[in-house]
A protein has these predicted regions:
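Short glycine-enriched, charge-decorated loop/helix-capping segments at active-site entrances
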Residues: 106-112, 171, 235-236
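Active-site beta-loop-alpha junctions enriched in small/polar residues
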Residues: 8-10, 38-40, 69-71, 96-98, ...
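Hydrophobic faces of well-ordered beta-strands that scaffold small-molecule active sites
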Residues: 3-6, 33-35, 64-68, 91-93, ...
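Alpha/beta catalytic cores of nucleotide-metabolism and tRNA/nucleoside-modifying enzymes
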Residues: 3, 9, 15, 120, ...
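Glycine-rich, positively charged N-terminal anion/phosphate-binding segment
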Residues: 8-82
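N-terminal small/glycine-rich loop or linker at the start of catalytic domains
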Residues: 1-2, 41-63, 97, 102-105, ...
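Flexible, glycine- and charge-enriched loops at secondary-structure boundaries
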Residues: 111-115, 175, 239-242
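Alpha/beta enzyme core
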Residues: 22-27, 78-91, 95-105, 116-191, ...
């Protein structure tokens, strides 16, 4: 079964994708890296700075899948054409983002409020776009029972793969992913199905593979940020060593400093990564508080050095 890295705004950018592959290698890399969503410009004029994230030269290694956030099917199809011209084979459509700033515009999982709009959107996409187009979705807006009508629409189109995150929009990321609701979906899907949601350990990956052997893949987001060696461990390899984590985080810090042109901006991005990674270190509670408060690069470097004097927590 294939393992995918989920698209996460502020985390799974090109700096992270390259650094993850460098430090965790073939055994620990994702089979596919889904890039954080981009929105097609309404004037159909591409902004070079925004497209730099998907420049093929900046994305060697494992396949990268661009993700689009849109509500105009024809505009999305045009953008798919632009991405095909860059050499991308598959493009993913985001019908799952639960952020209020997105859903208020009728995009992401906000589109699921009206299945007729989902139908019109996909009609616009598939009438004008060529090649594989996959979809990432939630179960609905208010309750999982909404998914039956939504899936009926998905089944009308040649979607190359359907990634299902079994929460509804209103949940955001609260509560637990609804595995029971997910289990009802694959037998009714006409396309390959990928699972996404609340996967944080190798044991959970293996349990999903055993329970749903027909899945095309499993997509992991926060779990992979919290344990960058997760896929390696699931494939029978070793947990991350302190030396690997040190090199990985140092390269991320330097990469973000170069990308943003500012070590201060890089510190802000690194603090987001440390929110998940700090729990790899035993007894880091006091340093975690310091990490949250600091702002200056020199403060960050001092605290990180202190964190790396601590022992690692034993993985499952």
């Amino acid at each position: 079964m294939l393992y995918y890295a989920a698209p996460m705004e502020g985390f799974t950018d090109r700096v992270w994708r390259q650094t993850h592959q460098k430090w965790f290698g073939a055994q620990g890399a994702a089979d596919r890296y889904y890039a954080p969503f981009i929105s097609p410009p309404e004037n159909r004029v591409l902004i070079k700075k925004k497209m730099a994230e998907l420049a093929p030269a900046a994305n060697p290694g494992a396949p990268v899948i661009p993700q689009l956030l849109a509500k105009d099917g024809e505009l999305a199809a045009w953008m798919i054409g632009q991405l095909r011209a860059l050499g991308y084979t598959e493009v993913n459509l985001n019908l799952g983002c639960p952020a209020g700033t997105v859903t208020a515009k009728g995009k992401g999982s906000g589109m699921l409020r009206d299945p007729a709009k989902v139908d019109a959107f996909l009609e616009g996409v598939f009438s004008h776009a060529e090649g594989p187009v996959s979809v990432k979705t939630r179960l609905g807006v208010e309750k999982p029972e909404e998914f039956a009508a939504i899936l009926e629409i998905y089944n009308r189109y040649p979607i190359s793969e359907l990634t299902i995150h079994p929460r509804v929009m209103r949940q955001q990321y609260r509560g637990q992913a609804d595995r029971a609701a997910f289990a009802a979906a694959p037998p009714r899907c006409t396309m390959p199905v990928c699972y996404n949601g609340d996967v944080t350990t190798a044991a959970q990956l293996h349990a999903l593979e055993e329970e749903f052997p027909a899945l095309s893949g499993i997509m992991v987001g926060r779990g992979l940020i919290a344990d960058p060696a997760l896929f390696r461990r699931a494939r029978g390899g070793a947990p991350a060593t302190k030396e690997e984590l040190r090199g990985y985080l140092t390269d991320l810090y330097h990469g973000y400093t170069e990308l943003f042109g500012s070590a201060g901006c890089a510190v802000s991005r690194m603090k987001a990564h440390w929110f998940y990674l700090i729990h790899c270190f035993a007894g880091a509670e006091k340093l975690e508080k310091q990490l949250k408060k600091l702002r200056e690069p020199w403060e960050y470097e001092v605290v990180v050095n202190q964190i790396f004097t601590l022992p690692l927590v034993k993985n499952d």
